[in-house]
């Protein structure tokens, strides 16, 4: 099946079932179907009134597909630091006042893909990446997005819930310094501790020790958590409990801090789906990714968005460099110029 010719589609890599492609026409619904497959595709704000996208057909794709097409020519525009610097200053002011522990500004870089290439080719580049990443995509005739994320929001099987804290970033060659970096350790532990505190009232939670996850171009701290829930809940219950984790949201997480984060993201022109949950449901098994390491398009215009955690010990120069490092990593992941 040639993804480039499909006018609409949804794709995800499931941990046990591999690559799954949903084809249209899609039926959209506020509730999941009683049976059959469905994709959960929402915005970061969780404000899509019909986030369940129910495909007309579901296809299992081979792990080794066709090689990606030749690299397209993309004219990128470097993002200006001015708007980011203003948002960063406001965050640091709130952290100093004790109103915030952490927040995550996200800023896009824009580009134009030149014809005859089309952005749907990016999906083919996503599905050919390493086994430690999860490709995902959603597109219509004129717009869409796709990504290659290492981060899962959770995997629900009955009352069992598996999730992860993924925060703290460095280059692989800096691992010796990274494992002793107080700023990166603090950023990670805020995320892990927040997830643990949200899950603990729901049942029995086990947590692994913090470790380093090497993704080739970047390394991160990772902690895995497993919940045996006292009660059965719907996927949307867990989405609203866990999203956004402090890896992409604010800590403390309140209506006020989330509204402020939404304002910061809007001012930085962050795509609505960046960092949003992206999931797949079938037969009571729900697997949900965190929509990062992604590219968004309308027509031939692209947006490559990255975010980075800001805590009390953050500096503007360090955070701006980290955002560029992450953008370069996304481009390398897609093998783009």
State where each predicted segment sits.
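A generic N-terminal leader/anchor concept
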Residues: 1-43, 47
């Amino acid at each position: 099946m040639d993804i480039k010719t499909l006018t609409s589609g949804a794709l995800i890599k499931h941990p046990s079932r591999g690559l799954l492609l949903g084809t249209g026409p899609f039926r959209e619904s506020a509730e999941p179907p009683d049976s059959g497959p469905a994709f959960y595709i929402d915005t970061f704000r969780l404000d899509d009134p019909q986030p369940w996208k129910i495909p007309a057909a579901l296809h299992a794709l081979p792990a080794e597909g066709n090689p990606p097409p030749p690299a397209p020519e993309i004219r990128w525009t470097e993002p200006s630091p001015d708007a980011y610097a203003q948002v960063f200053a406001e965050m640091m002011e709130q952290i100093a006042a004790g109103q915030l522990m952490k927040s995550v500004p996200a800023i896009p870089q824009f580009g134009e893909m030149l014809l005859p290439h089309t952005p749907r080719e990016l999906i083919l580049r996503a599905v050919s990446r390493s086994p430690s990443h999860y490709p995902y995509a959603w597109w219509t005739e004129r717009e869409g997005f796709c990504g290659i994320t290492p981060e899962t929001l959770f995997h629900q099987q009955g009352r069992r819930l598996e999730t992860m804290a993924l925060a703290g970033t460095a280059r692989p060659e800096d691992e010796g310094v990274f494992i002793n970096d107080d700023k990166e350790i603090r950023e990670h532990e805020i995320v892990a501790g927040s997830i643990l505190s949200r899950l603990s009232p729901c049942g029995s939670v086990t947590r692994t020790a913090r470790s380093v996850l090497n993704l080739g171009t970047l390394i991160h701290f990772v902690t895995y958590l497993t919940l045996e829930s006292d009660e059965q809940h719907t996927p949307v219950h867990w989405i609203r409990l866990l999203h956004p984790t402090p890896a992409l949201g604010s800590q403390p997480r309140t209506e006020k801090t989330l509204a402020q984060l939404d304002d910061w993201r809007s001012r930085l022109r962050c795509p609505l789906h960046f960092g949003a949950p992206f999931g797949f449901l079938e037969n009571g098994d729900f697997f949900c990714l965190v929509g990062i390491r992604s590219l968004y398009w309308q027509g031939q215009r692209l947006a490559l968005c990255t975010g980075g955690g800001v805590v009390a010990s953050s500096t503007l120069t360090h955070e701006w460099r980290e955002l560029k490092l992450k953008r370069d990593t996304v481009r390398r992941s897609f093998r783009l110029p």
